[in-house]
Amino acid sequence: LLIVMLLLSCLAGTLLISTNQNRNLVNQYVSETVELYVSQFQKEMDVMRVELINILESNEATNELPDYFNSESSQVFPILKKISEQLRIQAIWHDSVYGYYEYIGTSNALITSTGTKFSKSVKTSTERFLMVYLSANMTRRQNSLYHEFVKIEDQMYLLTWYMKGQKIAGNLIPLQRIFEDLENCTKGYTILPYIYD
């Protein structure tokens, strides 16, 4: 009976040590996975920054837009449609992005992947927020990139935008999506005991 008790206590000790070892390995793996995700997200943000700058600096369609146009300026409709399509494609490349947009301050026009909105257009709450917010920020420093946290209808976003002249290019990233991705990095790892020598 004493030998059985000793064997059971040795086995329990071995299981406890192996569980702790396994837990340490899982924690290390989760930590490294999260670090990798953050590193990838940072690289994606760097790519998006370059894309926003290129939209205003070297995009032919954006450069073809006149300084002022309105909802009755039919000559710019093909250009606006081309820009909308380019913004739609930009959003497809980045899973985390809610959407790309361009804002033309002189015309108070917001170009998104779904079309162009003017001051009297019917807009979603997000489009309405962007038009008001960006219009109010047109006096900020030119040729600059901005990152700001904004709240739109009970949801927090990372609003990134680049301004040149009276034009702004930017995107919205829901913070909830970032947090969900981080949380998913830590799920699915169970701790199974193994015999440790």
Regions found by a protein language model. Name each.
Residues Y101-Y103, N171, Y194:
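Conserved hydrophobic/aromatic positions in well-ordered beta-strands
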Residues Q28-Q40, E44-Y133:
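Extracytoplasmic/periplasmic sensory segments of membrane signal-transduction proteins
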Residues I89-A91, A136-M138, L159, L182-N184:
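Short, flexible, glycine/charge-rich loop motifs used to bind or transfer phosphoryl groups or to couple energy/partner
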Residues L1-N24, Q28:
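Extreme N-terminal signal-anchor transmembrane helix of membrane signaling/transducer proteins, especially
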Residues V132-K164, T190-D197:
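Membrane-proximal, non-catalytic sensory/regulatory domains of signal-transducing membrane proteins
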